Amino acid sequence: MAKYEIIPLVLGSLETDKSMMMMFMECGTKINIPIVSFYIKGAKKNILVDTGCPADVMMKYWPAPASDTQSFEEALEKLGLKPGDIDIVIHTHLHFDHCGNTSKCTNAKVVVQEDELKFALSPHPVYTMLYIRNMLERLNFYPVKGDTEIVEGVKVLHTPGHTPGAQSVAIDTAKGTAIITGFCCIRETFEVPDEARQLFPYWLVYTPGINTNSLEAFDSALKVKGLADILIPLHDLELGKVKKIP
């Protein structure tokens, strides 16, 4: 069975409130979350999970500071690749900060949950600012329904709540199953301290703060925490220090 490595490509950062990653918690605390595309190394095809988004585009749609670390093209060049070399883009979900470079991958099959694509093309008014239709036009979508193996050792898991069709990505590695979460979170989302557990004994994880269904979001966070040997929160604040996983 194939064993892969995951290469985080940190493209930039976006300022947000910490409560966006942990519902009800630390409201007013500002953090800079990394904007990341993940390359799956070792596959016969060139596979990315999400493609990030340029800072100027993010600031156009979201009222918060953003900055670029490197361009999408520069990040791929370090791997000896160009956007046209990408065969598969797996989208955790279709918020603009995760799919802002996908249109550059002109030869890629874009894997997304059916429920996510349907919602993205006709979002509820509350979430219209997170789905940018012109980012989605002309993409070669490959909709899937539920848990699906994409290639040997790479599987998507339907983990709704953050969005209706959020999907986490389970990847076989030499050190077990690594899961890139399909929802926006940080490592603290999964680390509820004892003092909080005394008040909320059933909170084994925090609920991701941006969600279309908070109950599903909690359940999905709990699900991936239980399944993963290596947990990769989508906006882990330490990703900029990581060259490869594991």
Where are these regions (language model features)?
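Conserved beta-strand hairpin/beta-sheet module of binuclear metal-dependent hydrolase folds
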Residues: 11-74, 168-182, 186
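Cap/insert and terminal regions of metallo-dependent hydrolase folds
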Residues: 69, 74, 175-246
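Short, solvent-exposed loop/turn segments at secondary-structure boundaries
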Residues: 60-63, 123-124, 243
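Active-site metal-binding loops of divalent metal-dependent hydrolases
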Residues: 51-53, 94, 116, 162-163, ...
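Beta-strand-turn-beta hairpins that frame and shape the catalytic cleft
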Residues: 1-6, 41-46, 148-156, 173-177
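Metallo-beta-lactamase
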Residues: 67-70, 74-97, 109-158, 163, ...
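Short, conserved loop/helix-junction motifs that constitute active-site signature segments
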Residues: 102-106
